[in-house]
Amino acid sequence: NQEVAYIKLHNLHWYVKGRSFFTLHAKLEELYDQTAEIIDAVAERLLAVGQAPVANMKEALALATIKELADKPISSEETVQGLIADVEYWIRDTKEIVELADAAGDGVTADQFNDYLGEYQKLLWMLKSYIV
């Protein structure tokens, strides 16, 4: 999902329109940079525990449960609403990963994803505050 989210954040960064363009354009760049760091850290953790990360878009798209966006302009309001929906998904997905890691006795992975969970929860709060 993070690989698809990374591309989706670029899409929003390029196609967002409206009065909040400058604010959202900058925030979306920050988010896709953070997402790239997360993708790298997760891939390295997977390799460290003997697993294989997804490293091609065909497989990423086949496995992803979040949806891509069309290459067309999107309003500031729709951008934030879509981000809220995606971040809520990231939170659910991350909680599930923490539970699975805990059940497997992998505290390192659980800790890593708990850190992401805190960041996603903070981002969700900020996005919801933005649209009030």
Language model region names:
Residues 16, 21, 33, 53-61, ...:
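Long, contiguous binding/interaction regions
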Residues 30, 56, 63-74, 126-130:
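Short alpha-helix boundary/capping motifs
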Residues 22-59:
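Conserved alpha-helical segments that form or flank metal/cofactor-binding pockets of metalloenzymes
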Residues 6, 13, 32, 39, ...:
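A structural signal for well-ordered alpha-helices, especially hydrophobic packing surfaces
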